[in-house]
Design a protein with these regions (language model features):
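Surface-exposed loop/edge segments in extracytoplasmic proteins
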Residues: 13-18, 47-50
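A short, charged, amphipathic alpha-helix used as a generic interaction element across diverse proteins
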Residues: 19-39
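Short, mixed-charge low-complexity intrinsically disordered segments
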Residues: 34-67
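Short aromatic-glycine-(Arg/Gly/Cys) micro-motifs in beta-strand/loop hairpins
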Residues: 1-12, 41-46
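Generic low-complexity, intrinsically disordered sequence content enriched
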Residues: 7, 14, 29-32, 57, ...
Length: 67
């Protein structure tokens, strides 16, 4: 699986979008103190896009690291 898009929704409803794992992880580290309400990860297997939703910062980081 390869990252297609990562959307980080902050507590103030601002949405940060990234298409790289490194940038997504950087956003998570930089914005964690501002409050993150959810992280939506779209990953592709080369044929289909699979979507994952997480409300946990730790789970989101782990999911991104596995891509």
């Amino acid at each position: 699986m390869v990252l297609h898009t990562c959307r980080i929704v902050l507590s103030n409803q601002q949405v940060l979008t990234s298409q790289s794992v490194e940038q997504s992880l950087s956003f998570l580290e930089d914005k964690a103190s501002n409050g993150i309400s959810k992280v939506e990860i779209d990953a592709t297997d080369g044929h289909q896009i699979h979507s994952y939703l997480s409300h946990s910062l730790e789970e989101s980081i782990e999911n991104l690291m596995n891509l």
